[in-house]
């Protein structure tokens, strides 16, 4: 939940357990590695962050560090969904009870069948500038389609080509919404706000459409 300090020296951490708060002291050093979201959250709750934000929540300022929680970046995934013709996809397997029962049997018997396969059947890296320097786009091919990630597949045969622009330049930020560790922080991620990110995303979608229009996929 927070780092324990003596002055500016980190001594250990405070954690939550079923028995209550637990204090763990370090013998050598404290390494904070809680991911892109929880790392700045824990730092801020420990008093290390933008002073004006910490004071607003009644958190004592140990180090005024304005960049904590700033420069947040993430990859956006854009999906092109297509109806398939004259072929079964995972959409049909998902909605067929006999097919699902057969898939479970095959997997239990010898770890084969579509349950033993990944959701992504092909991955491509592309250079939108054709400069032959390094890729700036990543594409995933999936033999199923959904309205949203995590949702059920469509009832019609479908496939998806996902486009992910690499090395995004759009930047967001994370700020505390409460001094309570159980309260999620405010996360602002302006996907595609940068004009170059938007241009690259459009090039990726155009490439996905050109791939899907090839005769082998019609």
Question: Which residue ranges define each predicted feature?
Answer:
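Non-transmembrane alpha-helical segments in soluble domains
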Residues: 40-43, 51, 79, 202-209
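Core beta-strand elements of the Rossmann-like FAD/NAD(P) dinucleotide-binding domain
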Residues: 19-29, 33-34
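Short acidic/polar mixed-charge low-complexity motifs
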Residues: 9, 20-22, 133, 170, ...
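C-terminal segments that line or cap access tunnels to active or ligand-binding sites in enzymes
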Residues: 123-129, 137, 142-147, 156-218
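Flavin (primarily FAD) binding-site architecture
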Residues: 32-57
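Mid-to-C-terminal "cap/lid" subdomains and adjacent gly/pro-rich loops that border
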Residues: 50-155, 210, 215-217
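A conserved short coil-to-beta-strand element within the FAD-binding core of flavoproteins
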Residues: 1-11, 18
């Amino acid at each position: 939940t927070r780092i324990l300090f003596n002055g500016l020296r980190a001594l250990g951490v405070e954690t939550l357990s079923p028995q209550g708060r637990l204090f763990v002291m370090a013998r050598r050093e404290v390494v904070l590695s809680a991911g892109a979201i929880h790392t700045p959250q824990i730092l801020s709750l420990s008093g290390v962050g933008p002073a004006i934000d910490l004071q607003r929540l009644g958190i004592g300022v140990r180090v005024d560090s304005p960049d904590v929680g700033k420069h947040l970046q993430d990859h956006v995934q854009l999906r092109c969904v297509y109806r398939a013709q004259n072929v079964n996809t995972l959409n049909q397997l998902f909605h067929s009870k006999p097919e699902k029962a057969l898939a479970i049997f095959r997997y239990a018997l010898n770890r084969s069948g579509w349950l033993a396969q990944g959701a992504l059947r092909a991955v491509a890296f592309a250079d939108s500038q054709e400069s032959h320097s390094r890729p700036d786009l990543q594409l995933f091919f999936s033999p199923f389609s959904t309205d949203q990630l995590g949702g059920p597949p469509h009832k019609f045969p479908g496939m998806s080509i996902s486009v992910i622009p690499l090395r995004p330049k759009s930047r967001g930020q994370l700020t505390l919404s409460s001094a309570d560790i159980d309260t999620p922080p405010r996360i602002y991620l302006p996907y595609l706000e940068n004009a170059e990110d938007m241009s690259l995303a459009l090039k990726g979608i155009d490439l996905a459409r050109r791939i899907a229009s090839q005769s082998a996929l019609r």
